[in-house]
């Protein structure tokens, strides 16, 4: 089992935290365990409340069912069902930017 450094950033929220996330745990779950307050609703990859945008790195979000191919190509990620596949940086609180 690999573990990756996931950096969660959002200038407006004053967020810049790096956490270690195993490749078999969701980013949102580990962030919560570390005391980082991120938005969420369904926790099942079926809405956009937890949306973030990948700035660098790779993630696996094959469990999600909400984002379309264009949104995924643009780098959007649902943190509630995203596993890290490399060290990565994610801009959080991106639900409004999706639309």
Curated annotation (Swiss-Prot):
Keyword Iron-sulfur attributed: yes
InterPro entries: 2Fe-2S_ferredoxin-like_sf (IPR036010), 2Fe-2S_ferredoxin-type (IPR001041), 2Fe2S_fd_BS (IPR006058), Beta-grasp_dom_sf (IPR012675), Fd_pln (IPR010241)
Record function comment: Ferredoxins are iron-sulfur proteins that transfer electrons in a wide variety of metabolic reactions.
Native source species: Halothece sp. (strain PCC 7418)
GO biological process: electron transport chain
Cofactor section: [2Fe-2S] cluster
Protein known as: Ferredoxin
Binding site for [2Fe-2S] cluster: 42, 47, 50, 80
Cofactor note: Binds 1 [2Fe-2S] cluster.
CDD domains: fer2 (cd00207)
Entry-linked Pfam families: Fer2
Similarity comment: family membership: Belongs to the 2Fe2S plant-type ferredoxin family.
Organism domain of life: Bacteria
């Amino acid at each position: 089992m690999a573990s990756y450094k996931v950096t969660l950033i959002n200038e407006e929220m004053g967020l810049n935290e790096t956490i270690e996330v195993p490749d078999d745990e969701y980013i949102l779950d580990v962030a919560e365990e570390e005391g980082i307050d991120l938005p969420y609703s369904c926790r099942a990859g079926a809405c956009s409340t937890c949306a973030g945008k990948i700035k660098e790195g790779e993630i696996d979000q094959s469990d999600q069912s909400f984002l379309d191919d264009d949104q995924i190509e643009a780098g959007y990620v649902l943190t509630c069902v995203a596993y890290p596949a490399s060290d990565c940086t994610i801009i959080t609180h991106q639900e409004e930017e999706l639309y």
